Design a protein with these regions (language model features):
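Short SAM/SAH-binding signature in class I
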Residues: 210-216, 303
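NAD(P)H dinucleotide-binding glycine-rich loop of Rossmann-like/cofactor-binding domains
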Residues: 84-163
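Mid-domain Rossmann-like dinucleotide-binding core that forms the NAD(H)/NADP(H) cofactor-binding site
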Residues: 73, 131-207
Length: 311
């Protein structure tokens, strides 16, 4: 089968990659669409130096084989973290933080830039008929945006600064706006900031400070900006992963009594509900064939992905 294999240094397009065989608790999934995430780019820069295999974790697919008859033939999306089921995190329902977890296309398991994958049945979510499968490709990153509201109690009275004007920020911004909070977006590109104007205040510079600051820049400089613009006793939520190491003055954190929270993967059901009900809107995905991966990774479109099969 076709696949994009990361050899530890670069991507290789293969047409003879071995098709996986499912386990008893797994489904064999025909990948219809796969989305490119910034994490994929970071892995290619060295974020996960131990990973070699098929990249990609955002997908929409069709269940071809499964012992769960309710899944057979259904269009699905899938959570990306697969826990061991035995550690303290798994036993208290925090599989995303399992110390032995496998992560699609990131750690210990081939990803979705290929034509077929196997994945555990209970990690799959059915895409209802009234949701376009191409729109469902936003489920995983949208769930990650929703997780911010799980990590921090954002109220209608909260004053929130979102740093970054890229794809992830656009998703986060729409989610935060639904809380009724006073949202301001700080970015560097006026043409991108224009997309936020319907639900947020937009700025390119400020000395004002905010109760909650979210860094979704994907750049180490975002943390520096967040520290300057968060109120004393405020909260910084970090939404990006970085290849580089970042230095932070811990004395400043202590003296100003700041809270810094990481936020990663999130709940799929609310994400599917928001997409299905049209509460969030995103531009269409630009799709490429796997063999054109270089064009895909260099595209400037809002969302880029792979279409794995011809119509």
């Amino acid at each position: 089968m076709k696949a994009l294999y990361f050899n530890g240094k670069s991507l290789e397009y293969l047409e003879d990659y071995e098709k996986p065989v499912r386990g008893e608790d797994e489904a064999l999934i025909k990948i219809l669409y796969a989305g490119i995430c910034n994490t994929d780019r970071e892995i290619m820069k060295g974020y996960r130096p131990d990973f070699k295999g098929v990249l990609g974790h955002e997908f929409v697919g069709e269940v071809i084989e499964s012992n769960d008859k309710a899944l057979l033939g259904r269009i699905v999306v899938g959570e990306i973290n697969r826990g061991c089921g035995h550690c303290k995190y798994c036993l208290r329902g925090e599989e995303n933080h399992c110390i032995n977890r496998k992560v699609l296309g990131i750690n210990g398991h081939d990803g979705v830039f290929t034509q077929f994958i196997t994945w555990r049945n209970d990690l799959l979510h059915v895409v209802e008929d009234n949701l376009d499968p191409k729109k469902a490709l936003f489920t995983e990153p949208l769930a990650a945006a929703i997780e911010i509201c799980e990590r921090e109690d954002i109220k209608p009275t909260s004053r929130v600064l979102l740093i970054g004007d890229g794809r992830l920020s656009f998703m986060i911004g729409q989610v935060i706006a639904l809380t009724g909070a006073d949202l301001t977006v700080l970015g560097k590109h006026q043409n991108k900031l224009d997309n936020f104007k319907s639900f947020a205040n937009v700025i390119m510079d400020t000395d004002e400070t905010f109760e909650i600051v979210i860094d979704a820049t994907g750049s180490p400089s975002g943390i520096e900006t967040a520290l300057k613009l968060v109120e004393n006793r405020g909260t910084i939520i970090v939404k990006s992963t970085y290849t580089e190491n970042i230095e932070i003055d811990l004395s400043e954190i202590v003296v100003r009594e700041l809270s810094i929270k990481g936020s990663r993967c999130g709940p799929f059901k609310p994400a599917l509900n928001l997409l299905k009900k049209g509460y969030v809107e995103f531009p269409d995905v630009e799709f490429f064939e796997l063999k054109d991966y270089e064009k895909a990774f260099s595209s400037k479109s809002f969302k880029v992905g792979f279409k794995l099969w011809e119509d």
